[in-house]
Amino acid sequence: IVDNAGNQVGEIGSDKMDSYFWLKSLKSKKAGIELSSKRKGSSLVLRNFKGKEIVNVGIDGDNGGSFLINDRNGVSSLRMSSLSQGGGGMKFFNLRGKETVFIGTNKINGGQVKTYNGLGSETIFLGTDQNDAGLLSVNNNIGLSRAVVGVDQSGKGVINTLVK
């Protein structure tokens, strides 16, 4: 695809088992919009004028859907995707690309929220436990459980704190 002056601004093609379509402005180094269909899935990628990937809508490693939003430097900020055990989840990342919050479905089809510190250690778990009851777990800065609020199998409230 060329503009009125004959400059290439896009392309439609295929390479082996893959098909693609891309468009770019003359000021961009890389394609601003890229649509590809590959053997293992398809994706739509949007890049900023610096060529950094900002949005990616596609297929994740488990053959489910994925939506990734990056900051202006291409560092991950938010990912929404289907999960391998079913359900869906959202992950939020800090400026270094480390996961800080997860909101989604757990392995027993309940909901959960997890927070992580800058070191990647889980600090809070809030969600559904094995008894389909609520559970809050508070961890120290290296991810070791220090306080748990929940419900036992008979339906009574439980508060546990760990001193060690």
Per-segment meaning from a language model:
Residues 1-164:
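Parallel beta-helix/beta-solenoid repeats that form elongated, surface-exposed shafts/blades used
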